[in-house]
Amino acid sequence: MKSPNETSFTNHTLENASTFGADLSIESNESLVSLDEYLSNTLPLHLQQLFLENLQKRQQGILESASDSIIEAVRDSSQQKFQNGLHLSLDSGVGSKGSVFSAWSFAQGLVIGQLSVIVVLIFFIKFFIFSEGPIKTEGPKGGKSGPKRDSAYVSPLLSTSTSHFLSSIIKRGESDGADSSENTDTDRKFSQINTILEKTYYNVETHSPETLDWFNVLIGQTIQQFREEALQKDNIVHSLNNFIARKSGELPQYLDTIKITELDIGEDFPILSNCRIQYSPNSNKQRLEAKIDIDLSDRLALGIETKLLVNYPKPFTAALPIQLTVSIVRFQACLTVSLTTAEEFVPTSENEASYGSENGGYFLMFSFSPEYRMEFDVKSLIGARSKLQDIPKIGSLIESQIKKWFVERCVEPRFQFIKLPSLWPRSKNTREEKTENDDISMKSTDL
């Protein structure tokens, strides 16, 4: 393959040769003498000129090809540099954005953390340090300021705003949400009972009765502790003697002073069984109650002695000694226990002031069914020399009075209310188990 420069050079040479041949033929026709001059002078000039022209054209082609290659190389290098620069700019942009984002995130976290600490400090200072304390009331002029204060003028330890704020924090479950404001009080209690039964997996209609063996053990330990304290410190005897001394002014004139001669608090324990949970009657399924069968076979005895005074025709004319011992040997009943509020019942006594002071909070309500069984053993001894022992009429009279007292207080439809203490943990109720080191330190202190 010939290059384009070589091809043009060959064509040009052929054209010159043809021209030269034509001129030679023309000149040879004109004159034969000028041929030598042409060969010696004119032909070298023509060849030199032809060589120079071909050399210039070849150099020009070489320069053009070199310039084209240089331009292409420059173009390729510029494109490559542009692409590399674009990649570098993109990488640098992404890195700068990442660094800016990380710095901004750190700044946000720092600012939010500082603000949260400031808010907590403001809350603590406002609601716990600068809250309204109890207002000290001054007594009248000239009078002594006693330790007693009128509770009506003492503000609560927490301010009203604090109490509202704390009450807004304590929330109940989802069932006590916005719908509770629309429901009535009856529907609310009914839904609460159903929620408790559902979440404790207890079906009132199908659940089988329980034996309460574990509860019998706890009750036995409690009663045993009570008996030990009574035997060691004579608490029951002192309490009864103090009660009799306070009531001595109310005794009839024909009775002398009463003295306690016997006190037996038993040695057995009650057995509770057949516990079942059911809806309270006449409550429209708004309150639950527990029915428990109780059985006690023991001897609970109280013995007293006194004198029957004969004040006619003059005071203390004669005195008839009387000794009585009343024992409960058997008690069977169905115990009803439930938790309720004081608003659901009314007091039976006329003194409603004490009831109003205790109104509020939750109460443990218990009562016994009318089909109870209470067996007594009454022993009586009347007289000094000729004594009458175990008179049936006296036994039946005492038994009827005790049952009457029991029915008026503890048998349905009457109930006994016991106010439950607050179950919230308090520091004054906190205790820990005593160790050997504590015993040694206490003994050394006593010595």
From Swiss-Prot:
Entry's transmembrane regions: 110-130
Coarse class of the protein's main subcellular location: endoplasmic reticulum
Domain of life, source organism: Eukaryota
InterPro entries in alphabetical order: Mmm1, MMM1_dom, SMP_LBD
Listed GO biological process terms: lipid transport; mitochondrial genome maintenance; protein insertion into mitochondrial outer membrane
Intervals, Lumenal compartment: 1-109
Keyword Membrane among UniProt keywords: yes
HAMAP family associated with the record: Mmm1
Domain observations: The SMP-LTD domain is a barrel-like domain that can bind various types of glycerophospholipids in its interior and mediate their transfer between two adjacent bilayers.
The protein's role, per its UniProt record: Component of the ERMES/MDM complex, which serves as a molecular tether to connect the endoplasmic reticulum (ER) and mitochondria. Components of this complex are involved in the control of mitochondrial shape and protein biogenesis, and function in nonvesicular lipid trafficking between the ER and mitochondria. The MDM12-MMM1 subcomplex functions in the major beta-barrel assembly pathway that is responsible for biogenesis of all outer membrane beta-barrel proteins, and acts in a late step after the SAM complex.
Protein's UniProt name: Maintenance of mitochondrial morphology protein 1
Organism: Lachancea thermotolerans (strain ATCC 56472 / CBS 6340 / NRRL Y-8284) (Yeast)
